[in-house]
């Protein structure tokens, strides 16, 4: 039997381009271990696990009723943590794919705390259209398979698929909170402060100083919207 982790995980998920990387950075500043991850706080090895699991489902979105539970998923994850000597640390996983296969993760870690990161649908779509690596709906064949012509219609479908998962997660009673990072654009850190407290962590007073400059572009957009 593999040694049990000391702390239940914190799962950070949401549709791509919703601000989950920003939230992961805040948790990192509060001492939460993210593992051997890329610049977007996505664990490189565990991402390989999830991508392999999702590869046979259309667009990587399985119907929850059709999901199968791998027998040794938790053991595989904690095997990674053993290698990283992280069994005794507060730890998080951040990935959009967590929501797509939430029932697998919930079976493995029923006491995990979930952060569902939200952003206005139109803003997510516009961000996907402008982001070079978000290419799935630049492929006309992919659009055709869903009965769409325009790329933005594909991204609207994409966001709605995530929203279905979020509803399922909440209705299933997962221990989760919904976070809207855009509140921090106007200097409102109250929701984030409460979340850090809910997670049993200590607030880092340097967070606004570090995060505020990262929100300048969003702040400019908001000012332009208010002036239009």
Q: Positions of the model-derived regions?
A:
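Residue-level detector of family-conserved "landmark" positions at structurally sensitive sites
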Residues: 37-39, 179, 206
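C-terminal accessory extensions appended to soluble enzyme cores
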Residues: 205-228
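PAPS-dependent sulfotransferase catalytic domain
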Residues: 87-204
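Generic detector of well-ordered alpha-helical segments enriched in charged/polar residues
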Residues: 47-51, 55, 74-82, 122, ...
């Amino acid at each position: 039997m593999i040694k049990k982790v000391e702390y239940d995980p914190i799962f950070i998920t949401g549709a791509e381009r919703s601000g989950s990387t920003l939230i992961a950075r805040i948790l990192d500043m509060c001492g939460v271990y993210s593992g051997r991850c890329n610049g977007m706080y996505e664990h490189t090895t565990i991402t390989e696990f999830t991508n392999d699991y999702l590869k046979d489902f259309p667009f990587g979105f399985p119907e929850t009723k059709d999901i199968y539970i791998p027998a040794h998923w938790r053991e595989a994850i904690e095997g990674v943590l053993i290698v990283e000597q992280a069994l005794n640390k507060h730890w998080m996983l951040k990935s959009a794919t967590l929501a797509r296969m939430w029932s697998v993760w919930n079976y493995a870690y029923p006491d995990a705390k979930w952060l569902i990161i939200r952003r206005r649908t139109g803003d997510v779509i516009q961000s996907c259209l402008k982001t070079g690596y978000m290419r799935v709906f630049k492929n006309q064949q992919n659009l055709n398979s869903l009965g769409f012509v325009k790329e933005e219609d594909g991204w609207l479908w994409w966001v709605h698929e995530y929203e279905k998962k979020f509803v399922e997660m909440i209705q299933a009673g997962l221990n989760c909170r919904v976070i809207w990072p855009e509140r921090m654009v106007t200097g409102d850190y109250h929701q984030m402060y409460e979340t850090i407290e809910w997670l049993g962590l200590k607030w880092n007073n340097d967070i606004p100083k570090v995060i505020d400059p990262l929100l300048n572009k969003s702040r400019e957009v908001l000012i332009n919207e208010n002036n239009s």
